[in-house]
């Protein structure tokens, strides 16, 4: 009996001592909760890319020939389509909001791009014995104001966008008619619309990189062309669109990871 009581007492003492030692040990730190990434922030940044445009110009042949010969001499309609290409470079500023407990993101962004897009085509002037005209079209700048809707996969955002856009264009029809030089020039700042899509990756708390495709449509309008050599003037109809692929970086002012 004594041995049994002693054994029970020893076991109880061992358990109590073990509990006391365990109570003195530091608690294991809790595993920190990983916060969900949020795209709610404002941003500013820069971009660079390439642009391709199509400009259907009607009718540079009639413009040149009828300026020298008088209205009605040119028969038929001629459309010349320079296709300007070049570099676009600029900046953007905007704000985004990600809905709570949701992957959906809405935002607004203003962007402006300078452009080196240039294109030219030649046209024959059959009544000029014959003559040749060089038809040129340039796009100098492309600002836009767009809304965007995105779907976030944590720190990766896929989005579509759309809004209003402006194109700053220059047009020139130059050459000679019956050995007489001419040089018609015109300017056009045209309002249109733009749609696009892209992807953005936030690689740190404040910085992200993106790639984007944009399509611009500016419809058609009449452009006044003036010849500074001979004092002629006339109208051409221009229908145009522009496509741009660009990439860039954004700095998120409030931190994309807030």
Task: Tell me the role of every PLM-derived stretch.
Residues 2-258:
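Gram-negative outer-membrane beta-barrel domains
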